[in-house]
Structure formats: C-alpha cells, structure tokens
Amino acid sequence: MRKKLIAGNWKMNGSLAANEALVKGLRVGVGASVCQVALCVPSVYLAQCQALLVGTAIALGAQDLSQHEVGAFTGEISGAMLQEFGVRYCIVGHSERRQYHFETDALVAAKAQRALACGITPIVCVGETLAEREAGRTEEVVKRQLAAVIHANGHCISEVVVAYEPVWAIGTGKTASIEQAQQVHSVLRQQLQAASIQADRIQIIYGGSMNAANAAELLAQPDIDGGLVGGASLKVPDFLSIIASAC
C-alpha cells in the first residue's frame, strides 16, 4: 500500500517571519501524521526551515537543482549542497520551469538523475497545456515527458515521485475533473509498470490546484497518491485540511 504524500510548493513566496509562523502552525497540526508531508521552500530559506522542522514528521524539500555536479555555473545550486541542508525531496520539471526557463525533457531527466545521485527524491512534474488537451494530445505529452526520465534513470525510476500537473489548472482555480485526473494517473501508472517491476510502489501525486475543498475526492482515487500543493500550502488551515484528507 502506497503512503500518501502531500508536498507543499511555496514557489517564490515567504519571508523569515511568515515562514516561522507558518511552520509553527503546521508543527501543531501535523503531529505524528500517517501520511508523508514535505515543504518545498525557496533555497534561501532552506537553513531556516531545516531548523524549524527539527523534531517534526515534515520533510524538507527544494524547488529545483542543477543538473551539474559542481563547477562554474553561476546562480546554480547542486544536489550536494541541498543534501547538506537535509533536503529529502526536490521538484524537477515544474511547468513554470519548463515555460519560463525553457527546460526540456532531457534537462528534467538529467536533474532527476542528479537528485537521485545525491540521495534526494525527485518530484518529477509532467503535464499538458490547455492547447495540448484540446488537441487530444494529453496522453502523448505526459508519456513523452515521463519517458525521458525513465530512459535516463533506468532501474532507479522506482525511487522517484511523479507529479501530474495539468498546466491549464495551475494557479487558475481550474481543476481537472476527478475522472480526468484519475485517467491520466492511470496512464502514467501503466507506463511505469512497463518500465519497472516496482512500479506499484511509485507515488503519483496530483498538482493541479488541489485545495481543501477538492482534496478528499481527488485523494480517494486509486492512482492518486497525494498532492503537490501550491497556494493552499501557504495557508495553515487549508494545508492541514488537505493533509487530514490524505491521512
């Protein structure tokens, strides 16, 4: 039985004071959760959040890492650096990185490989745009994106988390229907099963505007193993509600 994973993606939000208040609220509410909880925070706040999360069941996560191990790559952050701060999860290939930073499938696969090499679980994001969905290309797109990661990481694919994030549902308030979300998760599960005998242990989480109102129904689906939560992860009551739905 796969445990549910609820990962908060703070994106480019937060401040020292706000972070402290948020994590303190979560510390009280999460307790000894039976599901897995992570916070993927801006890199400048990793040290602060590492200290704030000591003694909790909440794992620390990052939002990106370099595909390079070390070297003259100004502005980049390596997996080894993240590892020193106790980072356990790292988002790779988020649609905002693909869109605004022109990250390709091959680059995302290389970043996932680098995370795994550093003992960090990559949360590999895949998803289609509205135009791709309306053109009937959803399955083609998500399978292509995931195939690159499978090809680059081979037997290690069982160590990743996959996040399906319909791009048209991120930050828009729109959500894929329960049926749409489960259908894509099922496609991804089948692709993983063809690639690994351990596919049934791989968590596939949903990242398209999961919130307190829709979390329970989404998380009840057989192939939805958690959520990559954006805006709702910045609000203690909402994030705790989603965690409760998963646990």
From Swiss-Prot:
UniProt cross-references to NCBIfam families, sorted A to Z? tim
Origin, by domain of life?
Bacteria
Q: What is this protein called?
A: Triosephosphate isomerase
Organism in which the protein naturally occurs = Albidiferax ferrireducens (strain ATCC BAA-621 / DSM 15236 / T118) (Rhodoferax ferrireducens)
Q: Where is the active site?
A: H94, E165
According to its UniProt record, in which pathway does this protein act?
Answer: Carbohydrate biosynthesis; gluconeogenesis; Carbohydrate degradation; glycolysis; D-glyceraldehyde 3-phosphate from glycerone phosphate: step 1/1
Q: Which gene encodes it?
A: tpiA
Subunit field text: Homodimer.
Q: Where in the cell is it found?
A: Cytoplasm
